[in-house]
UniProtKB/Swiss-Prot annotation:
A Gene Ontology term for the protein's cellular component: cytosol
Binding note for cofactor: Binds 1 zinc ion per subunit.
UniProt GO molecular function: GTP binding; GTP cyclohydrolase II activity; zinc ion binding
Identification of the protein by name: GTP cyclohydrolase-2
Active-site feature positions: 126 (proton acceptor), 128 (nucleophile)
UniProt cofactor(s): Zn(2+)
UniProt xrefs under HAMAP family: RibA
Encoding gene per record: ribA
Length: 205
């Protein structure tokens, strides 16, 4: 495996002080990050999340997706629980990159849904891979998880690298009038597990 650990530092956040662990993929040149909180040792399952980079949602507060809401909620839940992890993977735009994501947004502005936009650009609906999580989790000493996700591919990715996923914890947050159609497409076309009550929730302005 081409993933190597680089360094660890403290990361003060509104929810507490996390540890930030840096990893480098020598094959792709991508730099991935793991955030941890509390003591992860022992046999008890660890609350965690696989989160793919989303500059627009995570840093620019975009309402077109639910990514930023999911990241903040995951960090808050982990801090409240007292222990947990987030694997922050550099796979912008479901793996197509930032500029192609903007191109996809342009197509969505013209009426395409998130899957159709990717396909019109010549990409699969979801280009992400998760093989890098195995060495990251091994470095952190994690083997049993409670995974915060609505995406069955992430559950399967954990199981594929030998993780014991004892529970899938739904993470349905951030629905608003700008991303309602996007969330519906993720449920209908990508198999994301979201309750009907989520789609009936009151719109945020």
């Amino acid at each position: 495996m081409s993933i190597k650990y680089v360094a660890t530092s403290k990361l003060p956040t509104p929810w507490g002080v996390f540890a930030m662990h840096g990893f480098e993929d020598s094959e792709t040149g991508k730099e991935h990050v793991a955030l941890t909180f509390g003591d992860l040792s022992g046999d008890a399952p660890v609350l965690g999340r696989i989160h793919s980079e989303c500059l627009t949602g995570d840093a620019l507060f975009s309402l077109r997706c639910d990514c930023g809401f999911q990241l903040q909620t995951a960090m808050q839940r982990i801090a409240e629980t007292g222990r947990g992890f987030i694997l922050y993977l550099r796979q912008e735009g479901r793996g197509i990159g930032l500029l192609n994501k903007i191109r996809a947004y342009e197509l969505q502005d013209k009426g395409a849904n998130t899957v159709e936009a990717n396909e019109q650009l010549g990409f699969a609906a979801d280009m992400r891979k998760y093989d890098m999580i195995a060495p990251m989790l091994a470095h952190l000493g994690i083997s049993r998880v409670k995974l915060m996700t609505n995406n069955p591919r992430k559950v399967n990715a954990m199981k594929d690298v030998g993780m014991d996923v004892v529970e899938r914890v739904p993470l349905q947050v951030g629905k608003n009038r700008y991303n309602e159609a996007y969330l519906k497409t993720k449920s209908d076309k990508l198999g994301h597990m979201m309750s009907e009550e989520h789609f009936k929730a009151q719109h945020q302005d």
